[in-house]
């Protein structure tokens, strides 16, 4: 083989995946390093590329693109334990239609010497966050406002299930009456069994891994704005493999 042929062949080989490599990098940076090779492969296919996960992984390695997400445990706020509602979910997190099975919980963020408490409602059908409240303290009004916002979105008397742990706020008479008067069915996890509400735990772990642990914030106000932006991104853009490479809202 002549020298010119050798260098031509080497150049052709190195350029074979140049377009795909650029697109992989684009997807990686568009999502702030939150996507690993499997999710990037799914998004590549959404964009019309024929590529398998091994090739994506190779291109990422060559380009030194490493997913920055590491799932970490979190501790949600819980009060006294005392079950007042049955477990209607029983770890059956599958739903045939939107707004049929919902889950909620509270998680705590601690930064700049202060705390914030997030109370979202998660749709088991597609993983969408359909409503949420953010408070400085884990007070009952946070839960009631979250519930009222959820009812406004899904409508009254739908028979939807709203599942939670046995935290004190979910045992409160005002919360129970609000659900009952608007046709929502209350469901509670068993005592000390986090797996009964694992979809919420998974979401909180994802949220903290992809937002809190990846980003620097100027102050609490900056964090709050980024949190709102992240939930919007999560609902509208962040694809899920279990949804066939679609975001929650795209799947709905």
Identify the meaning behind each predicted range.
Residues 173, 180-184, 206-252:
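C-terminal domain-tail junction helix/linker
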